[in-house]
Amino acid sequence: MHLALFGATFDPPHNGHLALCLFARELLGIDKLIVSVSNNPFKPESGRADVHRMRMAELLTQEINLTGAFSEVSGWELEKKQPSYTVDLLRYLRTLYPADKLTLLVGEDSFREFSKWKESETFCSLSDVVVFRRVSTQSESTPRPEIIPCEACISFVNFACDISSTLVRSVVASGRSISTLVPPSVHRYIMEYGLYAGEEHHATSIPEPKPRES
């Protein structure tokens, strides 16, 4: 079985997360996707309560599974109640799935901090790493494979996405609609609980919808 791990704070999950998961499934032939809700050790402020982020991540996996994919949420990192590290989760998954192929899915923004990640030099012994690089980003902004300790297991994939959680929070706080930015179920949840309303965030403008290719 081919397992993939995709971790984020999911504050909140958005259509970029959904698109990345579905794209990775088709591209890599993933059998099972584990969506892990994390606390970023480089950003001590946890943001929304864990219960909200977990529930929104569950809604994200439901959206993924509606397409015929198989995904599930892991709250293992949150249960530790301390800064979480990817290497610890990978080791935990290895105890559960010792014989299966494991791939870590990483966004470009997160990968910029890769050299600071705990025990990054051990990743190749635990999993492959696929970095989803923004198409509009210049290549020199992403660390080059040769300066990464475990370069043999790292692959780069171009991925077009202009959405971020920061943008979603900013749009909600400004009173504008996020219906094009997040999955419908996540949208309803944010509105129901009044998340992000009246908060101050820094973000760019809402991306223009891209025309469909014929």
Swiss-Prot record:
Enzyme class: transferase
Catalyzed chemical reaction(s): nicotinate beta-D-ribonucleotide + ATP + H(+) = deamido-NAD(+) + diphosphate
One of the GO biological process terms: NAD biosynthetic process
A molecular function GO annotation: ATP binding
Family matches, as CDD domains: NMNAT (cd02165)
Biochemical pathway: Cofactor biosynthesis; NAD(+) biosynthesis; deamido-NAD(+) from nicotinate D-ribonucleotide: step 1/1
InterPro entries, A to Z: Cyt_trans-like, NadD/NMNAT, Rossmann-like_a/b/a_fold
Record keywords, A-Z: ATP-binding, NAD, Nucleotide-binding, Nucleotidyltransferase, Pyridine nucleotide biosynthesis, Transferase
UniProt entry tagged with the keyword Repressor: no
Keyword Glycosyltransferase: no
Family annotation (Gene3D superfamilies): HUPs (3.40.50.620)
EC number(s) per entry: 2.7.7.18
A family per Pfam: CTP_transf_like
Family of the protein in this entry: Belongs to the NadD family.
Function: Catalyzes the reversible adenylation of nicotinate mononucleotide (NaMN) to nicotinic acid adenine dinucleotide (NaAD).
PANTHER family: NICOTINATE-NUCLEOTIDE ADENYLYLTRANSFERASE-RELATED, PHOSPHOPANTETHEINE ADENYLYLTRANSFERASE
HAMAP family: NaMN_adenylyltr
Stated name of the protein: Probable nicotinate-nucleotide adenylyltransferase
Organism lineage string: Bacteria, Pseudomonadati, Chlorobiota, Chlorobiia, Chlorobiales
